[in-house]
Amino acid sequence: MVDKNIYIIQGEINIVVGAIKRNARWSTHTPLDEERDPLLHSFGHLKEVLNSITELSEIEPNVFLRPFLEVIRSEDTTGPITGLALTSVNKFLSYALIDPTHEGTAEGMENMADAVTHARFVGTDPASDEVVLMKILQVLRTLLLTPVGAHLTNESVCEIMQSCFRICFEMRLSELLRKSAEHTLVDMVQLLFTRLPQFKEEPKNYVGTNMKKLKMRAGGMSDSSKWKKQKRSPRPPRHMTKVTPGSELPTPNGTTLSSNLTGGMPFIDVPTPISSASSEAASAVVSPSTDSGLEFSSQTTSKEDLTDLEQPGSPGYSTATEPGSSELGVPEQPDLQQEGTHVEKSQSASVESIPEVLEECTSPADHSDSASVHDMDYVNPRGVRFTQSSQKEGTALVPYGLPCIRELFRFLISLTNPHDRHNSEVMIHMGLHLLTVALESAPVAQCQTLLGLIKDEMCRHLFQLLSIERLNLYAASLRVCFLLFESMREHLKFQMEMYIKKLMEIITVENPKMPYEMKEMALEAIVQLWRIPSFVTELYINYDCDYYCSNLFEELTKLLSKNAFPVSGQLYTTHLLSLDALLTVIDSTEAHCQAKVLNSLTQQEKKETARPSCEIVDGTREASNTERTASDGKAVGMASDIPGLHLPGGGRLPPEHGKSGCSDLEEAVDSGADKKFARKPPRFSCLLPDPRELIEIKNKKKLLITGTEQFNQKPKKGIQFLQEKGLLTIPMDNTEVAQWLRENPRLDKKMIGEFVSDRKNIDLLESFVSTFSFQGLRLDEALRLYLEAFRLPGEAPVIQRLLEAFTERWMNCNGSPFANSDACFSLAYAVIMLNTDQHNHNVRKQNAPMTLEEFRKNLKGVNGGKDFEQDILEDMYHAIKNEEIVMPEEQTGLVRENYVWNVLLHRGATPEGIFLRVPTASYDLDLFTMTWGPTIAALSYVFDKSLEETIIQKAISGFRKCAMISAHYGLSDVFDNLIISLCKFTALSSESIENLPSVFGSNPKAHIAAKTVFHLAHRHGDILREGWKNIMEAMLQLFRAQLLPKAMIEVEDFVDPNGKISLQREETPSNRGESTVLSFVSWLTLSGPEQSSVRGPSTENQEAKRVALECIKQCDPEKMITESKFLQLESLQELMKALVSVTPDEETYDEEDAAFCLEMLLRIVLENRDRVGCVWQTVRDHLYHLCVQAQDFCFLVERAVVGLLRLAIRLLRREEISAQVLLSLRILLLMKPSVLSRVSHQVAYGLHELLKTNAANIHSGDDWATLFTLLECIGSGVKPPAALQATARADAPDAGAQSDSELPSYHQNDVSLDRGYTSDSEVYTDHGRPGKIHRSATDADVVNSGWLVVGKDDVDNSKPGPSRPGPSPLINQYSLTVGLDLGPHDTKSLLKCVESLSFIVRDAAHITPDNFELCVKTLRIFVEASLNGGCKSQEKRGKSHKYDSKGNRFKKKSKEGSMLRRPRTSSQHASRGGQSDDDEDEGVPASYHTVSLQVSQDLLDLMHTLHTRAASIYSSWAEEQRHLETGGQKIEADSRTLWAHCWCPLLQGIACLCCDARRQVRMQALTYLQRALLVHDLQKLDALEWESCFNKVLFPLLTKLLENISPADVGGMEETRMRASTLLSKVFLQHLSPLLSLSTFAALWLTILDFMDKYMHAGSSDLLSEAIPESLKNMLLVMDTAEIFHSADARGGGPSALWEITWERIDCFLPHLRDELFKQTVIQDPMPMEPQGQKPLASAHLTSAAGDTRTPGHPPPPEIPSELGACDFEKPESPRAASSSSPGSPVASSPSRLSPTPDGPPPLAQPPLILQPLASPLQVGVPPMTLPIILNPALIEATSPVPLLATPRPTDPIPTSEVN
């Protein structure tokens, strides 16, 4: 079956042949002509061949292509026919009729390329001719882009490209055709550069020998002069040949010559070499002024988004990054070896030498167009070779490779040179466009030959283009620059520095001519660069951290920040672009932080094991490495990607290489061909230096810059400075200094010259010269290098010194090519003179420049008498003539530019030029530290000024990311700054309170700011420090404006029935008349704010407030408190400080604000109760300040007190803090009594709550002392212990100024100062007990923490030490009252305190020997306070002066609008918080009496309970102590202890209530007393204790009852007195036996008789006067029966002295009793009575009491003699004298002996002074009795009962009930 392709070819033959025949020439043709015509003949031959085969592959491609190619080459064919032949060829290529694997394919391709690029045809008209040209383009494109195109040679490819360029740049052609050519070129360039990774680098010698043929010339593609000569032919239309552009002119004879694409110039098809000079002369720029009539195409084609670089059409990127893929399978070509060329390994990096463009080789290598293309080997794209068997002479055709690409690249670069006059704008633009395509398509940097071009010419041209104001060229060059620095910045360190500096210059320049668009594009370019991963980090590492580079990153950051702030206030694109650039750093850093947070620990561990110890840097294109790196911010780069790790021959290190550390990596690099330096910058210790090292380098750099500046002024000074700073050694090391002089580009070359040429520095000059390497350099080249390092001074001796050093060095490096050193010196000098002669303008003006001959002549015979080699002199002459040795900093313009550029290239070739590529996320912290300030400032500005939603969101996103980063790295200062900035935008700080809801509610930006602030504080509160103040200020504003949620303004309260009160007072009508009047007046005057409040808020305002409330709800401010438990301690402490700072420290303050902050503080403390120990000090100091410093009651004080108690209630359960918490309750005792009394309600209720919930957690006596003292002060108005008050007052003036650590601390000895009072419990104390330490361990701890120490003894000195010095005034120890001065008290508070006591007492677990006495004392104080229904308190309350608030330290703000802010008064705050005196007085009568009655009854019950339980409590504790053998003070449970500490005080308390004015209370108390005295436990008491019972309980009771306690209830009082006297006699008789053993029995008995006397005359009724004698009879009879009156000494039992004294006393008031009872005179025979005398006693009890006896008032008694109690009593409770005892208390003096008197005074002469009879003459003759000083203790009012105990007599038949 015949191949279909054969038919296709036959069809094309027919079309072309038909066209030829139809042409005019064939109109009258004959077969003979057809035979003779070579074109038709070849077609006929081809037909025969095709007919003889069945498969097309049987013939070579050349066979069927040749006829068509001949038509294309033929000069005689017309355009249409040529076009048909081109179409056919294109079809063959498109249909793949040419087999790429066929051995003749290469030859065929070469022929085709040659024919099409040299196509000739007879022109018809311009339009038709352009069609042919279009088809030529089409064929060329298809040819290169189809697979068979790979067989084309380098020369063919160059010719193809050249043809396309010619059409592209021919301005006479239509724009459509030129654009088509441009698109064709784009496709071709893309293909060639896409294939770049497949080509191998050619050895330099091969490149040199072959380059000549491939020169493509830049510049104009046609000679413009020829255009002008072309004329239209005047021939008739049939013969007229429209000349195609570049066609030759018609000859006069009418024959048409060929139209050649070369434009009539030997451009491609002429093999003779063209010198550069002639080619330049032959090509002129085609400008718009030519008669082509065409305009420039100013349209730019490079507007694609630069982010789309990674297109699938650029496989070079992905393949190049795979290990081992640097050479993709093209093997070394054998034909090159056959030619004798040696394939060398290409060098890994040509950074050591200046990258020079390879020179053109001048060796002629003719290459004929018609070379035999049949004889060649074919190598297909995969490298498979097809060798023809019959190979003929001639060279083999080599497929194209790197040479043509390099030549194309060089040509494209030359097109971009703006200083080349031949390059039009169109050409420059085209060059840029194609370079863009090339860079987008291939990893050009991997090709060293191309890299050299990029480093030098390409970068230079691009930077020059940045100064051109043609925006399309400017934009295109920016685009190319981006591609360069994105992909190969590691090779272009100093180029990039220059580029960025140029961009910065464009952005900052204030030139009005500079278009805004240029600035915008420059900024856009920077932003694009900054978005490249790691780019910013690399800027920082390679420039900021390089001693001799600019601080690019720092300067750019400053520039961008400054540029983000609009001067006019209006935001433009440039401002937003600047912000974008700054945010790129933030964005990338934040993304890395997120990645670190998200990565699990296991992944980190895996990476740690796999990561090399010295990180390897990723040097591939960053765009292909977009995925984020490892969580620790370091990436594992491939060894192949490190600059310099491309080993010779394109090989790579094996993967395991480079993992053992920096040294291995460097060794691997050193093992390559270039061993001059490692690929690590010498300033770093490792490829990834740590941040500390970078900081050191930065600091060193600053010093170096300073040193450089000083050197440039005065070299010695600069060197000295650097030596002082340790950067240069002392003494000066010449080598080190010389190296510095060479390295530092900032040094003034003139100063270097002066310094090294100084004759003092001869050694330095040697070292300096030795830094140059002159090997292999001609003398003038070496001298050029030498003289560019410094400026040659003008003095001859100095020049001589410098040149001598130079020549010596040069000869050392190059041997001795000259006769001697003088010859060398002379030649060097001659070169300098020649340079001056040729290039110095002044010299040129005077003389003509020196010629070569003159130069030679001058040096004749200088070389040791001989001449120098003439060739060398000629070379030197031309080198100097053509290129001046530039004296640094002397030249300007292009010369200077060239010099600067050469210096840049030189620096790039040294180790200084190493550019370090770093992994993403390295040094994020360093960068963020440098950028956060400018970025936050810029964000704030943009946020403030912008109205666009997107920009606002971008700014907020920036804020959030900054916050996240600062949180990640723990940068508090950054986060604080951020919060403070954001708080300004919430509109909460600036607005007045009245407007705040409406302003805030209607400001969406403020909403966003507020939500952001709160969100960030919730999320990253851990690192917030100073910012808390701003947040709290915002919270306060919300509070003032009533925008906070209800939960935040409702706080716990003890008194309120709901348990909560609101901190915000509701707006209620004022509750006082005058206030109403004021409101009315203000309404009348229509003062602004009031007016609006009267009218009511508008709808808009209401809506705004609703929105504001909704926004605040979303902010969730309460979360700040509830989640404070998760804050780090430091942040928590700062938060608390911020809250504490809103304190009445200043002269003015706002009470509600302070209360709100206090409540937040307390809630935070409670939230943090798990670690409350850390913050307790702060909150305690704050509460101390609020409570103790308050001079008058206010709401804030009340909240502080409630807060303290709330804390105590919640925190007491925590063992570690409970002691400190209880100690802190003493703050309440330090308060001013007047203030404390005003908060008594709250304290009473709070203490009740505390005891109910936490009594079990209170263990130590000290703590109980605090609580009981508090209960006493609150419940009964007792003034707090004076020592505390004294210390509090002493602190008052300066306490406000104290910091946390400065609170007054008191030392041990301070506490034991002489207080001038006796604490209540001291009275109960056994004075013989050894002293104890006055302070608990807790106190000692607190001293250390700087807190005011209050020892237990100061609060309640229950256990006094013996060390108190000095005498003290006496107080009456024998009184029923506790002897305290009770202030006014609040009834409800007392009731609550009694409830609290009741709770403690009724739960047996809470009462222990530690707190028993305290409890009893408190009960007694309450008894005294509730006595007579608290009348004493009411009297005092009425008299107590009202405290004047003028002296109040805390003054409220009298700020404008404060009245408006609080038109609200709170009924609850006023009535319950303030409890004014008026309220209290009015409120008392209504409910007080029932309440007080209840109180008294409760107290009685409690005392009785304690009395009955005392023995069991003490004994059980004593037993437990013995069992556990615990240390500490021993608990005694004997009767003496119990009496002294328990029973006696309790009996005194009950007895006290027996003296109540209320009958019900008195009677109940008497009943309780009777029960108590007869209780079983008391029977164990001995005589002394019973005596004490009389002295301390019964006698004081009887004395008190003599007073007119209840004038209204006369009968009741009579009954009370009768019951009391009966109780006296009953107790006396019951315990008569033990009492008889007392030595003081007589005194006791006489005192009883005194009371009998008084009581008989006390009432007005007969009740007592009848009952008393009966009782007395009973007692006398019992005593007589017991033979008490019988003298033991007298024989026969005569009457004793007691008998005499008794009757002396009785006779005073009952003179006839003796006769009634003892009618017989003999005492021995007593009256017949029962021995115990019970019955009369009983009858005495049953006597009814009636009548009203009133006791007259007693005059004040005399003072007790000081010796009476000095040894017995402790210091008095208060500084009052003993004479302040209650009136009516008789006082007795104590005579040393009793002297009876025979006659007594009249019965009622002095009834109150009972002691009068004792001193009567009755006592004369009575033997002296050993009485102690307490002869008549009942007459002394005292506060300290003495215990009494006794065992009941079993014979006593009287049940207790009888007493009732």
Swiss-Prot record:
The modification Phosphothreonine is found at residues 508, 1338. Residues 693-883 form the SEC7 domain. Residues 531-551 are annotated as: HUS. Residues 227-241 have a biased composition (Basic residues). Residues 250-262, 290-301, 335-351, 1298-1311, 1465-1474 have a biased composition (Polar residues). Residues 1285-1297, 1775-1792 have a biased composition (Low complexity). Residues 1-211 are annotated as: DCB. The keyword Iron does not apply. The modification Phosphoserine is found at residues 350, 353, 663, 1299, 1319, 1321, 1336, 1476, 1774, 1785. Residues 620-631, 1433-1447 have a biased composition (Basic and acidic residues). One of its GO terms (cellular component) is Golgi membrane. Ubiquitous. GO terms for biological process: cell activation involved in immune response; cellular response to virus; cilium assembly; COPI coating of Golgi vesicle; endoplasmic reticulum to Golgi vesicle-mediated transport; endoplasmic reticulum-Golgi intermediate compartment organization; establishment of monopolar cell polarity; Golgi disassembly. Its main location: Golgi. InterPro entries: ARM-type_fold (IPR016024), GBF1-like_TPR (IPR056604), Mon2/Sec7/BIG1-like_HUS (IPR032691), Sec7_C_sf (IPR023394), Sec7_dom (IPR000904), Sec7_dom_sf (IPR035999). Residues 887-1371 are annotated as: Phosphatidylinositol-phosphate binding. Residues 215-266, 281-372, 620-666, 1285-1336, 1351-1371, 1431-1484, 1726-1809 are annotated as: Disordered. The keyword tRNA processing does not apply. It is found in: Golgi apparatus, cis-Golgi network; Endoplasmic reticulum-Golgi intermediate compartment; Golgi apparatus, trans-Golgi network; Golgi apparatus. Residues 1-381 are annotated as: Interaction with RAB1B. Can form homodimers and probably homotetramers. Interacts with COPG1; the interaction is independent of ARF1 activation. Interacts with ARF1, ARF3, ARF4 and ARF5. Interacts with RAB1B (GTP-bound form); required for GBF1 membrane association. Interacts with GGA1, GGA2 and GGA3. Interacts with USO1. Interacts (via SEC7 domain) with PNPLA2 (via C-terminus); the interaction is direct. Interacts with ARMH3. (Microbial infection) Interacts with poliovirus protein 3A. The DCB (dimerization and cyclophilin-binding) and HUS (homology upstream of Sec7) domains are necessary for dimerization. The DCB domain is proposed to support constitutive homodimerization; the HUS domain interacts with the DCB domain which may occur intramolecular or intermolecular. This is Golgi-specific brefeldin A-resistance guanine nucleotide exchange factor 1. It comes from Homo sapiens. The gene is GBF1.
